[in-house]
Amino acid sequence: MARVASTALPLELRAVVAGLTSADVADDQQWILSLMRKHGLAVITLLWRMLGSEQDVLDAYQTAICRLTARGCNGMGANPSGYFYRAVSNAGIEILRARQRHRACWPAVVEVQRRHSEDRSQPMGLDQREMIDKMRQAICQLPTHLRNVIVLRELAELPYSQVARILGIRNGTARLYRREAILRLAEMVGREANP
């Protein structure tokens, strides 16, 4: 069960209640505003005692108001005040249950994340580093026009249209340069692998 909070409302919650006096709404929404003005302080105090957290109080209050507004004045039955209190209480109880579920499930979530992080691939091995170094050297050996296209297209992952615009060439030319660069890189890396 939640701890019993102090009955003194924090400033932010008092500001919510005080703001109800100056609120201006359409005529068809006056019913909800009158409920909020009449019972606002009491339900916010109820939520404060129930939840003990300003943010949770505001969330529950907003949830209840949104649900009541969506339901409409006619959907509240013969006792709108009682319905208002019940809606606010239900919103508060939902937050308490969500906290309970969070506390119950959080250790399992942490364990899954820990296992997932252990399953991730280990840092690059020596072979991978050597291969990356060879690829970098091969890219540096390419002619400038091919190197520019391969860097922009493959490393920066830009679309051909943007690569072409940056380099001042046509899309088809960018595609052709990329193809040529890949063929040359494959040849260079293959030559180094099979001397």
Would you name each region that the model predicts?
Residues 86-108, 128:
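Arg/Lys-rich amphipathic alpha helix in sigma70-family domain 2
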Residues 25, 52, 62-80, 98-100:
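Sigma70-family region 2
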Residues 43, 47, 57-68, 84-87, ...:
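Short, small-hydrophobic-rich alpha-helical interface motif
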